């Protein structure tokens, strides 16, 4: 019997393959073996930070919008408090700015509205504008302290006669005002020593001129004091006793008669006729 004539079935392995395919795997299959848990954590953290940043930006925008609304409300309240004429001027200016801005948008931003003014703002009111300018000037003004050197001030850098006179007048008015606070300290600690210090660079001739000027001042003050003293005492500035007061005029006895020594015989009333015998 030949092997070719026999019939027999050859077992197939397809069933086994199908069984492998039909099996259900509950475990998730990773797409890649290179995924690191730390990378996953970093990615998740980055997403959370991005979300928090987005929320913060949104909140900031909401706060900014609220701030603008409050500012606009305040501007309108201030605008309502203005007088009628000022309101009309500001409204006219706002309308003009709006027309210029519309024209600039129409012509593609050719700078039609660039006239140096911003959009309508309540701060453009003349009084408010002046107040802001003064405030800005005060802020930009250098702060002077006791340690600030005076020679840095432009006033202490004179170059001509007019500037020296301005310096003299300014110093004179400022320093003499200190005598009102304390005349004793002004005289002993400032005026006398300051005059001496100022005469140090002078020549002998100019120093004598200073002395002559002071002598004139002394004589003038002596005359003023003497005038005030004599005026209080009733005298004159030259030292005299002053004008004598006129005596009141005597009133004549109209209708009376002239009396003489014979008219009054009262002294002989006590004598009798026998006294003459």
From Swiss-Prot:
Keyword terms: Coiled coil, Cytoplasm, Initiation factor, Protein biosynthesis
Coiled-coil stretches noted in the UniProt entry, renumbered to this chain: 37-82
Domain of life: Eukaryota
Chief place of localization: cytoplasm
UniProt biased composition (Acidic residues): 20-39, 262-277
A GO MF term: translation initiation factor activity
Region entry Disordered, spans: 1-83, 223-277
Pfam families xref list: eIF3_subunit
InterPro entries (UniProt xref): eIF3-like_dom_sf, eIF3j
UniProt cross-references to PANTHER family, sorted A to Z: EUKARYOTIC TRANSLATION INITIATION FACTOR 3 SUBUNIT J
Subunit composition and interactions: Component of the eukaryotic translation initiation factor 3 (eIF-3) complex.
Family, per entry: Belongs to the eIF-3 subunit J family.
Its biological purpose: Component of the eukaryotic translation initiation factor 3 (eIF-3) complex, which is involved in protein synthesis of a specialized repertoire of mRNAs and, together with other initiation factors, stimulates binding of mRNA and methionyl-tRNAi to the 40S ribosome. The eIF-3 complex specifically targets and initiates translation of a subset of mRNAs involved in cell proliferation.
Protein name (Swiss-Prot/TrEMBL): Eukaryotic translation initiation factor 3 subunit J
Lineage, highest ranks first: Eukaryota, Fungi, Dikarya, Ascomycota, Saccharomycotina
This protein's encoding gene: HCR1
């Amino acid at each position: 019997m030949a092997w070719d004539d026999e019939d027999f079935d050859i077992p197939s392995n397809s069933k086994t393959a199908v069984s492998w395919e039909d099996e259900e795997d509950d475990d998730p299959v990773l797409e890649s073996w290179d995924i690191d848990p730390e990378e996953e954590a970093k990615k998740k953290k980055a997403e959370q930070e991005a979300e928090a940043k987005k929320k913060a930006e949104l909140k900031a925008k909401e706060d900014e919008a609220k701030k603008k609304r409050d500012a606009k409300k305040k501007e309108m309240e201030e605008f309502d408090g203005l007088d009628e004429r000022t309101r009309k001027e500001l409204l006219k200016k706002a309308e003009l700015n709006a027309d210029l801005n519309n024209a600039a948008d129409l012509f593609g931003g050719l700078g039609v509205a660039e006239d140096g003014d911003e959009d309508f703002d309540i701060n453009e009111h003349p009084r408010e504008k002046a107040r802001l300018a003064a405030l800005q000037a005060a802020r930009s003004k250098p702060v002077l302290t006791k340690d600030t050197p005076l020679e840095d001030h432009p006033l202490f850098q004179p170059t001509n006669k007019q500037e020296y006179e301005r310096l003299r007048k300014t110093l004179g008015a400022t320093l003499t005002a200190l005598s009102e606070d304390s005349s004793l300290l002004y005289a002993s600690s400032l005026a006398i020593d300051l005059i001496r210090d100022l005469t140090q660079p002078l020549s002998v001739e100019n120093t004598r001129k200073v002395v002559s000027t002071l002598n004139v001042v002394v004589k003038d003050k002596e005359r003023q004091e003497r005038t005030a003293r004599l005026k209080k005492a009733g005298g004159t500035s030259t030292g005299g006793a002053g004008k004598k007061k006129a005596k009141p005029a005597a009133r004549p006895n109209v209708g009376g008669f002239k009396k003489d020594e014979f008219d009054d015989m009262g002294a002989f009333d006590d004598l009798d006729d026998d006294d003459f015998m």
